[in-house]
Amino acid sequence: MTTVRTRIAPSPTGDPHVGTAYIALFNLCFARQHGGQFILRIEDTDQLRSTRESEQQIYDALRWLGIEWDEGPDVGGPHGPYRQSERGHIYKKYSDELVEKGHAFTCFCTPERLDAVRAEQMARKETPRYDGHCMHLPKDEVQRRLAAGESHVTRMKVPTEGVCVVPDMLRGDVEIPWDRMDMQVLMKADGLPTYFLANVVDDHLMGITHVLRGEEWLPSAPKLIKLYEYFGWEQPQLCYMPLLRNPDKSKLSKRKNPTSITFYERMGYLPQALLNYLGRMGWSMPDEREKFTLAEMIEHFDLSRVSLGGPIFDLEKLSWLNGQWIREQSVEEFAREVQKWALNPEYLMKIAPHVQGRVENFSQIAPLAGFFFSGGVPLDASLFEHKKLDPTQVRQVLQLVLWKLESLRQWEKERITGCIQAVAEHLQLKLRDVMPLMFPAITGHASSVSVLDAMEILGADLSRYRLRQALELLGGASKKETKEWEKIRDAIPG
């Protein structure tokens, strides 16, 4: 009997996402329930955004939750390497095979030509797609241009009519028309693969038998299915999990809810409570109990109990469940968990340099640095009264800063400063005009340790969470203001 093998393949491009933990949990439970294996693979082909620091954060966050894997970059295994950036020669081999078989072709189209084609198609109200310009180039021309070092990509061929039947373990057969599919790029100009080629090659070579992934990938499933067909490989069974959603039913995003696992760790949530809550996202125990352990979830796991309705990730419900876990701990367990959270040596070392020069005894630390250890901070509207800005302008500045910070890919002091500086300059203000608003929003006080250093230490999600709280206290933005301010945001450089 074939051993069940599942995997999670996150990209190390930022803080580890609760959506990654959610999909990892269900893959882990499915594998363990069937006596199988769970693999961690790192999809780091986006060399501009991928970092080893983010990769380490993924390991730390999943292990904090109690999710362990049998094979991966850090633990090894018989199917390595487990980082896609280290498998380039493998993808090149299979990409060349597709070209040789006539299932893919070399494309020399420039970005400028592709943009022009898309613009023409959109003007005709057509779905933008590649027009096949390079699909039938003579072989000698292709070889000549390759020998000349001309920039190129490899694209797969796809049918233009009919439907692809996608067998989904949750929905049954799903029919998707081929005319919705573009001629997908498989190998980029930098020699690295796109998600589609790397995904299929890796899943096959690593013996993955079942793929549980988010339903946002369902519309592009025909491309993956066609690649398996082109290679002549057996396709894993597919399961498209419902997406986590905000309370307003929109897709879970950092603009409306904190999404990083690190945020919930910093806020003092218990890992077993967060894992329990993620387990309840679209799934339920046979007896409908709300509180259960990972071992209990594995024991009773059955995909037939997954609901296709978009599960709502509600911070209030998570907090309620976390409270249930806390109250059922012994006093000794509770004290140990508090100590582990409050006296985290790594976190304290980040804070200490900013506090040491401002205190004369240790009892002064709590009032000065308490905001580093809380979720929200006590907010006083009077602290946002500004000598130069009226209340509407105050809200506008905070909203614009929040939006700019939401688009920040790397959370570093210099980049945070750059975002705030860009907003100030665009509004013809000085940085010193904006900073008095940042102090109360982030620290709850009119003055404190460097607020920019504090934001770097607190992290992206917690900093943005506090800015949202400050905006809500001051009345937020009306629909009309939001539209007007979005135009201003889009005009701000950077």
Curated annotation (Swiss-Prot):
**Annotated motif 'HIGH' region, positions:** 10-20
Does the UniProt entry include the keyword Magnesium? no
Q: Where in the cell is it found?
A: Cytoplasm
Q: Which positions does UniProt annotate for ATP binding?
A: K254
Where on the tree of life does the source sit, at the highest rank? Answer: Bacteria
Q: GO CC annotations? A: cytosol
Q: What is its main location?
A: cytoplasm
Q: Which residues bind Zn(2+)?
A: C107, C109, C134, H136
Cofactors (names):
Zn(2+)
Task: Please name the GO terms that the record assigns under molecular function.
Answer: ATP binding; glutamate-tRNA ligase activity; tRNA binding; zinc ion binding
* PROSITE patterns per the UniProt record, alphabetical: AA_TRNA_LIGASE_I
Q: Name one GO biological process term.
A: glutamyl-tRNA aminoacylation
Q: Which reaction equations make up its catalytic activity?
A: tRNA(Glu) + L-glutamate + ATP = L-glutamyl-tRNA(Glu) + AMP + diphosphate
Record keywords? Aminoacyl-tRNA synthetase, ATP-binding, Cytoplasm, Ligase, Metal-binding, Nucleotide-binding, Protein biosynthesis, Zinc
Q: How is the cofactor bound?
A: Binds 1 zinc ion per subunit.
| Entry EC no(s) | 6.1.1.17
Q: Where is this motif: 'KMSKS' region?
A: 251-255
The family annotation for this protein states:
Belongs to the class-I aminoacyl-tRNA synthetase family. Glutamate--tRNA ligase type 1 subfamily.
Function, as annotated, reads: Catalyzes the attachment of glutamate to tRNA(Glu) in a two-step reaction: glutamate is first activated by ATP to form Glu-AMP and then transferred to the acceptor end of tRNA(Glu).
**HAMAP family recorded for this chain?**
Glu_tRNA_synth_type1
Q: How does it assemble?
A: Monomer.
| Name listed for the protein in its UniProt record | Glutamate--tRNA ligase
What organism is recorded for this protein?
Answer: Pseudomonas aeruginosa (strain ATCC 15692 / DSM 22644 / CIP 104116 / JCM 14847 / LMG 12228 / 1C / PRS 101 / PAO1)
Species lineage: Bacteria, Pseudomonadati, Pseudomonadota, Gammaproteobacteria, Pseudomonadales
